[in-house]
Curated annotation (Swiss-Prot):
Family: Belongs to the isocitrate and isopropylmalate dehydrogenases family. LeuB type 1 subfamily.
Name by which UniProt lists this protein: 3-isopropylmalate dehydrogenase
Molecular function terms, GO-annotated: 3-isopropylmalate dehydrogenase activity; magnesium ion binding; NAD binding
Localisation per UniProt entry: Cytoplasm
Annotated source species: Bacillus licheniformis (strain ATCC 14580 / DSM 13 / JCM 2505 / CCUG 7422 / NBRC 12200 / NCIMB 9375 / NCTC 10341 / NRRL NRS-1264 / Gibson 46)
UniProt-listed SUPFAM superfamilies: Isocitrate/Isopropylmalate dehydrogenase-like (SSF53659)
Residues reported in the UniProt entry to bind Mg(2+): D224, D248, D252
Site (Important for catalysis): Y141, K192
Gene this chain is encoded by: leuB
GO biological process: L-leucine biosynthetic process
Amino acids binding NAD(+): 76-89, 282-294
Pfam assignment, any one: Iso_dh
Pathway: Amino-acid biosynthesis; L-leucine biosynthesis; L-leucine from 3-methyl-2-oxobutanoate: step 3/4
EC number(s) stated in the UniProt entry for this protein: 1.1.1.85
């Protein structure tokens, strides 16, 4: 199989973890006889510094010419004082809008070998395996007006607008139900319908979509209760679907169930089939360039790409199994090591590649005896 992948390293540790993912993808290509072409593009602070904009047109063109997109991370204090249109995060928001990346999938799965790294007791997180489906292109982050100004009395004021079309709600909720059909068959729709008009429409829309999926159970949960339940009883969830800002907050909360943001991959899906994959963690500029960043979320994001965009289920499982084998062997990056000896970014990437090669060799031997 031949595929073109757009690579957007971004800022901070983004280039380091993306390099790790690319190294693993090259190993996959070698072991499974695929050909992956890589084209780099600028985004975020790096794009502001070099091209004067957080999302250059050349980057958008490179993405549209690709079969899938891998992103590192964007942002950092270096650009905090820039005007809003020259903030790194604007590049991420813009690419979501331009490519119509409407649904963000964030799997939350606790690796058995990492249960001790979670801040929660093992009995609370045992068997946790759910996905947060977050709407990406509407809501408070995109609604207009959104501005700061001085009123007639000389006092500073600010306004943001929470705006949604029903069609934007429908498509992401439908995506959640379709996913639930191949999992445990349960969707938890999270809103604030006791206060917000947009949430009342969200809840109504979820009820309507649910009628298309009689084999899937729908439950509604207010966002404040959902935040509590994620800590109190995370094992109850299968698919959580929610609007943009609620999903942004809840997914970061849920990420700590695994013990580190460095373990969580994500996918942003478009209606066109051109999807973007990225680790959940941020750019972590304080550790950039030190070879200590955890690349496993980026590597697992690449595995999601293999499965979702390319239909390469065996290859995706091989990467995930290699990561699991490395963790079971006790290999840890600094964020997971809790003061003990730890692996560097490059060394744990090498461990994953070695486990992938071993797994492939065993598969070849087994095939020879069939």
């Amino acid at each position: 199989m031949k595929k073109r992948i757009a690579l957007l390293p971004g800022d901070g540790i983004g280039p380091e973890v993306l390099d790790a993912a690319v190294d693993v993808l090259k190993s996959v290509a070698e072991h499974y006889q695929h050909e992956f072409e890589f084209e780099y593009g600028l985004i975020g602070g790096a794009a502001i510094d070099e091209a004067g904009a957080p999302l250059p047109e050349e980057t958008v063109a490179a993405c549209k010419a690709a079969d899938a997109i891998l992103l590192g991370a964007v942002g950092g204090p270096k650009w905090d004082q820039n005007p809003s249109e020259l903030r790194p995060e604007k590049g991420l928001l813009a690419i979501r809008k331009q490519l119509d990346l409407f649904a963000n999938l964030r799997p939350v799965k606790v690796f058995e070998s990492l249960a001790g790294a979670s801040p929660l007791k093992t009995e609370y997180i045992e068997g946790v395996d759910f996905v947060i489906v977050r709407e990406l292109t509407g809501g408070l982050y995109f609604g207009k007006p959104s501005e700061q100004y001085v009123n007639q009395n000389g006092e500073e004021e600010a306004v943001d607008t929470l705006f949604y079309k029903k069609s934007e709600m429908e498509r992401v909720i439908r995506e959640a139900f379709q996913m639930a059909q191949s999992r445990k068959g349960k969707v938890t729709s999270v809103d604030k319908a006791n206060v917000l008009e947009s949430s009342k429409l969200w809840r109504k829309t979820a009820e309507e979509v649910a009628k298309e999926f009689p084999d899937v159970k729908l439950e509604h949960m207010l966002v404040d209760n959902a935040a509590m339940q994620l800590i109190y009883a995370p094992g109850q969830f299968d698919i959580i679907v929610t609007e943009n800002m609620f999903g942004d907050i809840l997914s970061d909360e849920a990420s700590m169930l695994t013990g580190s943001l460095g373990m969580l991959p994500s996918a942003s899906l478009s209606s066109s089939g051109l999807h973007l994959y990225e680790p959940v963690h941020g750019s972590a500029p304080d550790i950039a360039g030190q070879n200590i960043a955890n690349p496993l979320a980026a590597i697992l994001s690449a595995a999601m790409m293999l499965r979702t965009s390319f239909g390469l289920e065996a290859e995706a499982q091989a990467v995930e199994h290699a990561v699991d084998q490395v963790l079971r062997a006790g290999k840890r990056t600094k964020d997971l090591a809790k003061g003990s000896e730890h692996c560097t970014t490059q060394s744990i990437t090498g461990e994953v590649k070695a486990a992938l090669a071993d797994d492939n060799a065993i598969s070849n031997i087994m095939t020879a005896y069939v």
